[in-house]
Amino acid sequence: MRTYVFEKPLIRGTMLKRKSQFTALVDIDGEELIAHIPTTNRIGDVENKNLPCLLSYHDDPKRKLKYDIEAVLLSDDENWVGINQILSNKLVEYFFNEHELDEIVSDFDRVQREVNLGISKLDFKVGDTYLEAKTPLTTINVKYGKNIKTLPPKPFSSTGRMVQHLRELAGSLKDHEKAVFLQVFQYRITEKKKRLRSTHYEEVSQTFKESAEAGVEFWEIQMDFRPEGVTLYSVTKSADLFKSTYRATQDQS
């Protein structure tokens, strides 16, 4: 297995509390400072307080905040959960180029990023295959540690881009043999959890169904995230991604 190695090992710290959508107060070796959160989504259903975290440091004079929170620890083991969605695409590109993802696409001469398709811009074109990668964070599929506090779950509503991308992937099959929707988990799944229905559940459900019928393939990859780097842990093709990851939870009433 190849490892995506960080330029410098990540720094251990503690996320004391989330201050805004993009910032958090962190403690690094007793010093409190503000760090950037590289995701616009919430991190599961956990309270973002006193969470062990891994941070990258960026000595760029143009940056106001020098630290990014790259991962958090929600379990009692060293199963770090990567939260940087920009890093996800770098990892996917790396593992394709290292031929660690040949199960998904094996016949290609280059990996292209940010490729226009229809009215959308998809994440990748691997050889002749269009591929969209998503890093779901609203549900974290790990067994929480004893000190993790949870919050009442909230339904996810930002599904418009995903629906559009699925439709573009399905449409690409008119001229291409293959199209892939890839879920990227920057951690090892240890406990599968149900998601609440999104606020646009019916539209999302129908789009997944139509895309699968058109021939779009659904895959997921898990990773082993460490302070030094990231290793691919598993590659799985899902015959019924929608039911397995977007099913409704039982009524809470």
Question: At which residue positions do the language-model features occur?
Answer:
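Short aromatic-glycine-enriched beta-strand elements
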Residues: 20-26
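Short, charged beta-turn/beta-strand-edge "cap" motif at the junction between a beta-strand
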Residues: 17, 57-62
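Domain-level recognition of nuclease-like catalytic cores that cleave nucleotide substrates
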Residues: 186-253
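Active-site metal-binding core of divalent-cation-utilizing nuclease and nuclease-like domains
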Residues: 75, 79-86, 93, 97-98, ...
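OB-fold/S1-family single-stranded nucleic acid-binding modules
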Residues: 60-79
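Nucleic-acid nuclease catalytic cores
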Residues: 140, 144-200, 222
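Short nucleic-acid-contacting surface segments enriched for D/E, G, S/T with interspersed K/R
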Residues: 40-54
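Extended boundary segments
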Residues: 1-16
